[in-house]
Each structure stands twice: as C-alpha cells, then as structure tokens.
C-alpha cells in the first residue's frame, strides 16, 4: 500500500482534486489511468478524440458528475455554478451522443478511465470559470 501511495497519490490528486482522503480503490484507479496514458492504447486515443471533439462545458459536466461528486446532479451543479436542470440537460445531451447513460456500469467504465486520463493530460480546469 505504501508503494501505491508513493507512486500514485500525485496522479490521484490530479484526477480527483476535490477529495480530501484517498482509499486504495482511488489509488488503483489513478494507477490504471496512468498506465493507460503511458501505453497510449487505441481506446485511450479514441476516447481522448471523442472528449476533445465535445464542447468544453460538456466534458467539465462529465468530470464533475462522475469524478468529483458521487453522481449527484445537485452537487455537480453547485461545483460548476449552474442550475441542476442545466446538469440534467447536459447529461441528456451526452447520453444521446454516446448512446448510454454516463455513470451506468459497465458501459461507463472506459468513460471513467478516459476522464481520468483527460485530467492527467490537461490538469483540472477551474470549474468556476465555465459559466453556462
């Protein structure tokens, strides 16, 4: 566990910046994202292209909803300074685009990892700057 913490805590802090404490699953998730980034597999590249082609506010909504809050629409809205109905609208738009509901497993597994890799590549943008 010590080795996991020492190697992947910085990545976990980048991927999950609003967490105060990290458990073993968080660190293993960070390790998986870090490995995906280093291996640059075709799935990672495909997902990064999909995320890059989306509007910035939709990607930020996904990260807030899936990574920063426990899939809580109201908390995601508070984090992004938008109304919860805006979050619902954006998630519906994303669902239509991807063909599945974000957060529902197992369909969302690759999406979670892609968002983690996205944060490792680009850091954590300040959601307060997003607006509508």
Language-model regions, residue ranges each:
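Cytosolic nucleotide-utilizing catalytic cores of signal-transduction proteins
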Residues: 1-132
């Amino acid at each position: 566990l010590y080795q996991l913490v020492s190697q992947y805590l910085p990545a976990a802090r980048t991927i999950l910046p609003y967490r105060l404490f990290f458990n073993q699953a968080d660190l293993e998730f960070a390790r998986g994202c870090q490995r995906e980034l280093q291996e640059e597999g075709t799935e990672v590249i495909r997902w990064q292209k999909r995320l890059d082609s989306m509007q910035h506010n939709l990607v930020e909504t996904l990260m807030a909803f899936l990574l920063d809050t426990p899939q809580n629409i109201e908390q995601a809205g508070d984090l992004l300074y938008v109304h919860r109905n805006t979050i619902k609208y954006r998630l519906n738009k994303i669902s239509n685009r991807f063909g599945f509901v974000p957060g529902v497993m197992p369909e969302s597994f690759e999406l979670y990892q892609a968002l983690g890799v996205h944060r490792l590549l680009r850091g954590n943008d300040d959601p307060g700057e997003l607006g509508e």
